[in-house]
A protein has these predicted regions:
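Chalcogenol-based redox active-site neighborhoods
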Residues: 1-155
Length: 155
């Protein structure tokens, strides 16, 4: 699958949130969405990214947008993480990483000299028409929050 670029239509998906409710991206048309992929609940970088979006959430809402976090973790892990960090947005479970693959957010990583496949920290800002207005793959947690928040304000 070719890499997603600004101007492309965001691939549709349906995933369960932390309560088991299904979230379908296309049902959010008419709203701006910050969709971010992160490797694992309650780990340092992922907590930094999630809490960054939490702290910016009032200005994100003011811009007419919402945030959806996606990782391979299940509902129980998401519920615990969301509660612990007081996150005001939904966390979606992509346990088979099919949605991450669609978005190019699944790829080869390396830790301590070992290569493995995993989530590449990424975000995608989607406008009201369902088009991508910002695409960042392999972004740092702090840069992700800043860049996505800036993009959603001008989208």
């Amino acid at each position: 699958m070719p890499a997603l670029k600004v101007g492309n239509k965001a691939p549709d998906f349906t995933l369960p949130d932390e309560t088991g409710n299904l979230v379908k991206l296309s049902s959010l048309k008419g709203k701006k969405v910050i969709l971010y992929f992160y490797p694992k609940d309650d780990t340092p970088g992922c907590t930094t990214q999630a809490c960054g979006f939490r702290d910016e959430y009032p200005s994100i809402e003011e811009a007419g947008a919402l945030v959806l976090g996606i990782s391979p973790d299940g509902a129980k892990s998401h519920t615990k993480f969301k509660t612990k960090q007081k996150l005001p947005f939904s966390l979606l479970s992509d346990e088979d990483h099919k949605v991450a693959e669609k978005y190019g957010a699944w790829g080869e990583k390396s830790m301590y000299g070992k290569k493995y496949m995993g989530i590449l920290r990424s975000h995608f800002v989607i406008d009201e028409a369902g088009k991508l207005v910002d695409v960042q793959i392999g972004v740092s947690p702090k840069d992700s929050v800043r860049l996505a928040t800036d993009a959603v304000r001008v989208a």
